[in-house]
Protein backbone atom coordinates (compact mmCIF):
# COMPACT_ATOMS: atom_id res chain seq x y z
CA UNK A 1 0.00 0.00 0.00
CA UNK A 2 1.32 3.47 -0.80
CA UNK A 3 2.22 5.99 1.86
CA UNK A 4 -0.52 8.27 0.53
CA UNK A 5 -3.12 5.52 0.95
CA UNK A 6 -1.83 4.62 4.41
CA UNK A 7 -1.75 8.19 5.75
CA UNK A 8 -5.47 8.57 6.59
CA UNK A 9 -5.61 5.08 8.11
CA UNK A 10 -2.51 5.63 10.21
CA UNK A 11 -3.76 9.09 11.22
CA UNK A 12 -7.00 7.59 12.55
CA UNK A 13 -5.01 5.00 14.47
CA UNK A 14 -2.68 7.61 15.96
CA UNK A 15 -5.64 9.75 17.05
CA UNK A 16 -7.44 6.71 18.51
CA UNK A 17 -4.27 5.79 20.42
CA UNK A 18 -4.10 9.30 21.87
CA UNK A 19 -0.72 10.01 20.30
CA UNK A 20 -1.81 13.10 18.37
CA UNK A 21 -4.83 15.12 17.35
CA UNK A 22 -6.18 15.36 13.82
CA UNK A 23 -5.10 19.01 13.72
CA UNK A 24 -1.54 18.15 14.80
CA UNK A 25 -1.25 15.47 12.15
CA UNK A 26 -2.74 17.71 9.46
CA UNK A 27 -0.21 20.43 10.27
CA UNK A 28 2.64 17.91 10.02
CA UNK A 29 1.52 16.00 6.92
CA UNK A 30 4.98 15.87 5.32
CA UNK A 31 6.57 14.68 8.56
CA UNK A 32 3.86 12.03 8.99
CA UNK A 33 4.43 10.81 5.43
CA UNK A 34 8.15 10.49 6.15
CA UNK A 35 7.41 8.54 9.32
CA UNK A 36 4.98 6.19 7.57
CA UNK A 37 7.49 5.62 4.76
CA UNK A 38 10.10 4.70 7.35
CA UNK A 39 7.89 2.39 9.40
CA UNK A 40 5.84 0.60 6.75
CA UNK A 41 8.84 -1.52 5.74
CA UNK A 42 8.64 -3.46 9.02
CA UNK A 43 4.84 -3.48 9.29
CA UNK A 44 2.18 -5.87 8.09
CA UNK A 45 -0.84 -3.89 9.26
CA UNK A 46 -1.85 -0.32 9.99
CA UNK A 47 -1.88 -1.26 13.68
CA UNK A 48 1.76 -2.31 13.35
CA UNK A 49 2.64 1.13 11.99
CA UNK A 50 0.72 2.86 14.79
CA UNK A 51 2.50 0.72 17.39
CA UNK A 52 5.91 1.38 15.84
CA UNK A 53 5.13 5.12 15.69
CA UNK A 54 4.72 5.53 19.47
CA UNK A 55 8.36 6.50 20.15
CA UNK A 56 8.13 9.35 17.64
CA UNK A 57 5.39 11.19 19.52
CA UNK A 58 5.82 13.14 22.73
CA UNK A 59 8.93 14.41 24.38
CA UNK A 60 9.75 11.51 26.67
CA UNK A 61 10.76 7.92 25.99
CA UNK A 62 9.28 4.77 27.47
CA UNK A 63 12.20 2.38 27.82
CA UNK A 64 11.95 -1.34 27.16
CA UNK A 65 13.73 -2.71 30.22
CA UNK A 66 15.12 -5.68 28.26
CA UNK A 67 16.71 -3.29 25.76
CA UNK A 68 18.11 -1.19 28.61
CA UNK A 69 19.54 -4.26 30.35
CA UNK A 70 21.16 -5.51 27.15
CA UNK A 71 22.42 -2.26 25.61
CA UNK A 72 23.22 -0.27 28.75
CA UNK A 73 24.94 -3.01 30.80
CA UNK A 74 27.83 -0.80 31.90
CA UNK A 75 26.00 2.32 33.03
CA UNK A 76 29.11 4.46 33.46
CA UNK A 77 30.50 3.60 30.02
CA UNK A 78 27.08 4.03 28.40
CA UNK A 79 26.55 7.37 30.10
CA UNK A 80 29.95 8.55 28.89
CA UNK A 81 29.28 7.28 25.35
CA UNK A 82 25.87 8.96 25.21
CA UNK A 83 27.34 12.19 26.59
CA UNK A 84 29.98 12.12 23.84
CA UNK A 85 27.27 11.30 21.29
CA UNK A 86 25.25 14.28 22.48
CA UNK A 87 28.29 16.52 22.21
CA UNK A 88 29.08 15.29 18.69
CA UNK A 89 25.51 15.75 17.50
CA UNK A 90 25.10 19.13 19.21
CA UNK A 91 27.68 20.46 16.77
CA UNK A 92 25.59 19.39 13.77
CA UNK A 93 23.57 22.33 12.47
CA UNK A 94 22.40 20.87 9.14
CA UNK A 95 20.40 17.93 10.54
CA UNK A 96 20.36 15.42 7.68
CA UNK A 97 21.04 11.73 7.18
CA UNK A 98 24.50 12.52 5.86
CA UNK A 99 25.53 15.04 8.49
CA UNK A 100 24.40 12.94 11.45
CA UNK A 101 26.08 9.86 9.98
CA UNK A 102 29.32 11.76 9.38
CA UNK A 103 29.35 13.09 12.95
CA UNK A 104 28.69 9.71 14.57
CA UNK A 105 31.07 7.72 12.40
CA UNK A 106 33.82 10.28 13.06
CA UNK A 107 33.11 10.00 16.77
CA UNK A 108 33.34 6.19 16.63
CA UNK A 109 36.60 6.38 14.71
CA UNK A 110 38.11 8.92 17.11
CA UNK A 111 37.20 6.67 20.05
CA UNK A 112 38.52 3.55 18.31
CA UNK A 113 35.22 1.67 18.59
CA UNK A 114 32.90 0.10 16.07
CA UNK A 115 29.90 2.28 15.18
CA UNK A 116 27.56 -0.34 16.65
CA UNK A 117 28.99 0.39 20.10
CA UNK A 118 27.53 3.88 19.69
CA UNK A 119 24.45 3.20 17.56
CA UNK A 120 22.81 0.56 19.77
CA UNK A 121 22.88 2.54 23.04
CA UNK A 122 21.78 5.58 21.04
CA UNK A 123 18.84 3.65 19.55
CA UNK A 124 17.61 2.83 23.05
CA UNK A 125 18.08 6.45 24.14
CA UNK A 126 16.05 7.73 21.18
CA UNK A 127 13.28 5.13 20.90
CA UNK A 128 13.39 3.12 24.13
CA UNK A 129 13.81 -0.03 22.05
CA UNK A 130 16.61 -2.21 20.72
CA UNK A 131 14.92 -2.36 17.30
CA UNK A 132 14.06 0.56 15.06
CA UNK A 133 14.61 1.80 11.55
CA UNK A 134 18.13 2.97 10.72
CA UNK A 135 19.59 5.19 13.42
CA UNK A 136 20.19 8.13 11.08
CA UNK A 137 16.59 7.92 9.85
CA UNK A 138 15.43 7.96 13.46
CA UNK A 139 17.55 11.04 14.21
CA UNK A 140 16.17 12.91 11.20
CA UNK A 141 12.53 11.99 11.84
CA UNK A 142 12.79 12.95 15.52
CA UNK A 143 14.58 16.18 14.66
CA UNK A 144 17.58 17.82 16.24
CA UNK A 145 16.00 19.27 19.39
CA UNK A 146 14.02 16.18 20.34
CA UNK A 147 16.96 13.87 19.59
CA UNK A 148 19.34 15.89 21.75
CA UNK A 149 16.75 16.12 24.54
CA UNK A 150 16.22 12.36 24.53
CA UNK A 151 19.94 11.67 24.61
CA UNK A 152 20.22 14.10 27.53
CA UNK A 153 17.35 12.31 29.28
CA UNK A 154 19.11 8.98 28.85
CA UNK A 155 22.34 10.41 30.30
CA UNK A 156 20.32 11.66 33.27
CA UNK A 157 18.66 8.28 33.73
CA UNK A 158 22.07 6.62 33.81
CA UNK A 159 23.21 8.62 36.81
CA UNK A 160 25.69 11.35 37.73
CA UNK A 161 26.77 13.79 35.09
CA UNK A 162 24.76 16.19 33.06
CA UNK A 163 24.43 17.72 29.68
Where are these regions (language model features)?
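Small-residue-rich helix-loop
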Residues: 2-111
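Charged substrate- and nucleic-acid-binding regions of tRNA-handling and nucleotidyl-transfer enzymes
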Residues: 97-161
